[in-house]
Amino acid sequence: MKLTVLSKEEIEKIHHTTLKVLNEIGVAVRNKHALELLKRHGFKLDGRGDVVRFPKEEIEKTINAFSNDIDIYDREGNLALKLGRNKVYFGPGGGAPNLLDLQGNRRPSTKEDVAKVAKICDALPNMDFVMSDITAQDQPLKVQDLHELEAMILNTSKPLVPVCLGNGHFADTVYRIHQAVHPGDAGVGKPFIILYFQPSSPLQLDKEPLSRLLKAVEFNIPLIISGAMTAGGTAPVTIAGALVTGNAEVLAAMTIARLVNEKARIIYGVGGVAMDLYTGNFCYGSPELGFLSGVAVGEIAEYYDFATWGRGACSDAKVLDAQFGSEVFMNAIIPALGGVNLIHDAGRIDFGKSGCLEALVLADEIIDACRRVIRGFKVDEEHLAFEAIKEIGVGGTFLSSRHTLKNYKEELWAPKLFTRLDFTAWINSDKKDIEQRAHDRVEKILKEHRPKEVDRDLQEEIHRIVMEGERAVLSAS
């Protein structure tokens, strides 16, 4: 099934307005190496020092350079994610400073908590890639990202998208870890780590993220380039205007990436949120998220033929209540029906300021239901079921028919966490609510699940690379 909200004419209006912004207003490029690269290729500055005009012809070269056909592997070297049209995958987010822990306390998160997130996601069937969800607040600020990466690698074999706080040193570390895990793969032919670049709205590409971008595309590491504009704050309050702002930032950054490596594996995103103008909070649970990070972004990316990154299955709720369930389903189904390839932030709560292990488990269940909706249903001879109707006839039951036995598992979604007991049966059972059942599932995974193990020598090598990366970052600061 597919959801659309924009006509081709509307997408073209967004595109042409984006071209006007890039050519007439420009984007600040606050990295001397990126500026020198642009100057060598004939780009003009507008007289303010670092604001670059991006002409239409160069943007068209960028659009034509990159493909939506990107393969991502797991740590073991197996194909895990095949990006392209209507390929939809989910994963958690990253960067939350707090954890709503298993005792119900909201506290600063730790490296050990990140390891638990990775282990939980490794066990959850609908978490297709892994981010840290939270941050290693017990590590030095400038190298928290390195420690989060180490914790994830050792606790899941799924593809990783680490949140990076630093500069090109992080890309160096990622490349070295890839070489340690897959010796001889100098060209990163089977990438299991995707790096992340985020502009600063409105219309700014900052020094450290650009250093990371330049290194990533040089090493041929897949790179997400995603805006993070806030409608009503760092971008126009109108959805179309916010999309134009984010699109301009992302196409400018993609153009810089192209000048380094025309065959770079770039994943396009806008990733915007709406601001609540009454509280000043950035809303992860708003219906507008479905446009700013979901279906509209998917349609624009399809117009360009780019692989896509978006946001969804997240909530502004503080606990696992009715608001959480409502917002997570709303913001999972919209980007998924829009064909966004990689949908992150699953299970995020509290405006993205907190993580919660039980929330990941509950989001996984909701995503599973969403996938049933996305899959739709078949209309063919077998599924029209004329012969079954004829066999059962008037007034019969299909409960025990061969047709039901053959097709029910494919047709009817069965929950793993939600209950379908009637009230009497529920009263006579353990009477646990959804939060308690999610808690039990977390406890069971942490106790029983065994991710594919990294052998001891490789663990030590990864730790050595991380510590060398830490020293490089701290000595440069």
What are these regions (language model features)?
Residues 4-8, 24, 48-52, 107, ...:
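Hydrophobic alpha-helical scaffolding
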Residues 4-17, 25-37, 52, 358-477:
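Catalytic-core signal marking the mid-to-C-terminal active-site face
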Residues 9-13, 26-40, 46-48, 82, ...:
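N-terminal glycine-rich anion-binding loops that anchor highly charged ligand groups
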Residues 36-105:
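Glycine-rich, N-terminal phosphate-binding loop and its surrounding beta-alpha-beta segment
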Residues 39-46, 230, 274-278, 308-312, ...:
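Short acidic (Asp/Glu) and glycine-rich catalytic loops that position anionic groups and cofactors
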Residues 108-337, 341:
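Helix-rich catalytic cores of soluble enzyme domains
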Residues 294-400:
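Hydrophobic alpha-helical bundle architecture
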